[in-house]
Amino acid sequence: RFSGCQCRYPTNNFGHCLHGGPQGWQYQVYEGQIVNDSTVTMTMHSPDGDANFPGAVTAVVTYTLTSDNAIDIKYEATTDKKTVINMTNHSYFNLSGDPTKPVTDHILYINADKYTPVDSTFMTTGEILDVKGTPMDFTQPHEIGRDITNFGFEQIKFANGFDHNWCLNTNGDDTQVAARVVVSVWKYTLTNRESRYTVVTSSTDQ
């Protein structure tokens, strides 16, 4: 409910509206602009009432390749009404260099002692649970594939793998490592200022 108006949103996931619905922003065409040799911006205009969401929104994503070969992503959005905006990056990385190979041999570390479980419709339950003693524990680095088919664990069954949110121990300190993935000679390290981190492995047969 926004500004006294109850809004109904299009559903696309077990009766829920996921990622803005079936025509979410990820499916829209953005206006690209080259800022300099290392930076581009992508801008999208969403009109008031788009997918029943209130407010005309201008969303801007800025991608910068830094001097130390990192990718910096910044999000901005302006709107003329109260609305819901929760922009993020949804990239997938396969460090093997071969997209036909699964990521089950990738070594994953997540700096998190807790996670938020989901129900059978893939909505978070509101609980915050300990990872210790469960397949959700990546505080000691190990292969993603070790428990990815452990369907006796309900959370893996619901997600058909991993598609969960971990509560980071970093407390918003972006000088600490939030997560790391290693395979062969390649390493992907994530830092951020947020308190949560989501890992998605697609389905177990991919």
Where are these regions (language model features)?
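An exposed, glycine/acidic-rich loop-and-rim segment of catalytic or binding clefts
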Residues: 1-206
